[in-house]
Each structure stands twice: as C-alpha cells, then as structure tokens.
Amino acid sequence: MISPRVNTRVWQRSISLLSPQAAKTESNVVTKERTYIENLSKDIATSRFRLVDENGKIASITVQPDIPICIKKDCLVSIHNLNHLSLSYKWLNFWSNLIKFRSFKSSLFHRIIGSSVLEILAAPNFQISRRPFDSSRSLSVLNLTGTKDWNVFGKDSIIAFEQNSSLEIKSPIFPSARSLVSNSSKSQLPRKFQILNGRGNVLVCGGGLVYSIELIDECDKILVNSRNILAINGQSQLDIANSVERQELHVEGAYVGDSSNDTVAPKFIKNQTLKSAYGHTVQFFKRMRSWIRNQYEKRYIYGVDSYFMKIKGPRTILIQTHEMTTSKDNILTKLTSKSHVKKSTVNDNGVNLEKQVANDVNSKIIELANRPSLFIATVSQDGRVDFQSTSKFT
C-alpha cells in the first residue's frame, strides 16, 4: 500500500502544476532543480553541473582544468574558453551495452579536456529510432559523493559525466549473485540499467519531465510503472534489490459457473466411456473459452507492455513522465512511404507519375508540418496532390 504521506505529496504536486503561485507547501517532489544533492564535500574540486532552464532542456557544465568531461555523441551544444582544448572519444561499456541494448551508439562519448576552466552547454540532441531529437525529453543532474549507488535505466539515459578515478559506471549483463539470493524472482529489477557509484557528477536524461521523489523510511512505499522509472538509489546493490518488488496486475479469471449440469451427457448416450469423454470435452472447451477471454482482457484491455514496481524507502527515485507525443513525422512517413505510392507508370506526356507524386508531396511537407489543423488531400488522375485546410469546408 502507498502511504498517505506519499499521496499527499503527489497531490500537492498536481496542484502546483495547475497553479504554481498558489502552492506554497514544501514537498519532497523536486520541480525546478530536479537535482539530487548529497552534501558534496567542500574539499573535492569537481565539475559543476546545473540546469539552465526550468524545463531541463539544456544543461551548463563548468569543468575544472585538466579534468576530462565525457559527453554523449551529438549532445554537445557549445564550448566557451578554448585554451589548449583537447577532443577525443571514449567507449563506455562497449560490449556490455552492445549485448544489453543492441546498440553501440549508447557507448560512444566525446572526451573533452582543457587547460583552463571550460563552460559547456549540453542537450539531449541524439536520435531515437532513426528520428531526430525529441523535444519532450528533459535533463536531470546527479551529484554523487560515494555514499550511495544509483541505478539508471535506459540505453540513452546518461548524457554526460566527469571522468575521474572515483566515479565508476558499470553495465552488468547478468544480475549479481547477491541480488539473486536476496529474495524471490519478484524482487528483480529490470535488467537494462547502468550502475553509478563513487564520487562525481552525472547528467541523465528522461522522457517528458523528470521528478525526484524521496521515500523517507521503510514504511514509505510507492507503486511505479516500470516504464516511468528513470533512476533509483540505495546503500548498495543488495539494498536496492531488496527494496523493489515486481507486481503485475493480475486479471481475474472469467467465472465459469456450476458446470455440473452442463457436463451431463445427453440421454441418448448410453456408453459410460462416451459419457465421460463428453463431460471432459465440454469442460475443456469451457476452460479454453475462459482462458481466451482472460488473455484478451490482459492484452487488449489492461495491457501487458509494462508492469509495476513497489518500492520502499528510505531512498530517492527519479520519475520520468514519458509524455506521449503524436509526432508529425509518423504522418509524413506514411504519406511518402513506398506502400502508399503506386507502381511506376507513364502518362501521355511521358512523365513518371511516381516521381511526380513524390515531388508534389515533398513540396507540401513544410506547409503541412507547420500547420496544426487537419488537411484534406485530393489526388487527381494526372498525379497532382492538392492539400486544403479543413477550415475551408466549415
């Protein structure tokens, strides 16, 4: 069960979203900074990571001299103060990430070193599924002092980190033996995560908005959708494994009812063997119907794409909203895909209709993408495509 205290915090957060000026009550849900600070020691000269805007779209990184900083490919925006600047690349957990995420791009980082203080801007400009940067992604900063471990989920979650002798980023392929024997199989975390431990700064990225929720004690629990968890911390990997319990939403089986009368064979069946076979056959089809209905409700009504994790404190978790976006690229891809273009034919003028249709559609892409309203496309026999706004038909 989720404690009333967590419900109160989440409800207060929902009020602050609607009316930010009216909600003055302090909450454990971090909104602006979205930065988990662990009282970094003053005698440690490290880099400084901070978010430039409240939406977390871009981050500023102040790098001390001769301290390497690693930034994910395509995420570097700008560098200020270019005195004796050195740029190279670094593969982070190449083989483990390749096996786990089936992608080598998640391991490629640009390594930057300067002889003076550098001011760097970084943003999540990497491509996802062959599509350009998704503006719904936002950043969050983790400041580690070595007292706790962080598990960060997702192949593209780590955007930047400072490379020092203390900070360690691991990507285990198989769960550790200690986590396996800690509890039952229900306590296992999703396997696709990376472990952060030691001291240093790490810039992570999540879908939609990113919020930090603090669970105060062991009685403080929360139920989180597995797709929405970005990171979780703990005293050790064993502590994190023991704090998470996997819970799936079970669908109640369909009520079959009293089938004692239904399995009775008709009077014209005299043979006892046939009567028994008839009863077993009827019962089999009833159970099969119940199973099909159960699977249908589980897959199409309740959904099986995700499961829930019950997490108990004390610890801090990062939640990503995973805002659902209806990208215009999906519509444009369907319009220009080969399946929507007929085979090449030649008209009376010898013009290739397929190329003409493709060129006509491409000429309207910019206009179509910049207008939020709906359009009606009219395709004439000669291959011309005419787009008209629905406002003209009202």
Swiss-Prot record:
Claim: ATP-binding is one of the keywords in the record: no
Segments crossing the lipid bilayer: none
Subcellular localization: Mitochondrion
InterPro entries listed in its UniProt record: AIM24, AIM24_sf
Gene3D superfamilies: Mitochondrial biogenesis AIM24
Pfam families per UniProt: AIM24
Superkingdom field: Eukaryota
Range of the transit peptide: 1-111
Record GO biological process: inner mitochondrial membrane organization
Chief site of localization: mitochondrion
Keyword Mitochondrion attributed: yes
GO annotations of cellular component type: mitochondrial inner membrane
Keywords, in A-Z order: Mitochondrion, Transit peptide
Name by which UniProt lists this protein: Altered inheritance of mitochondria protein 24, mitochondrial
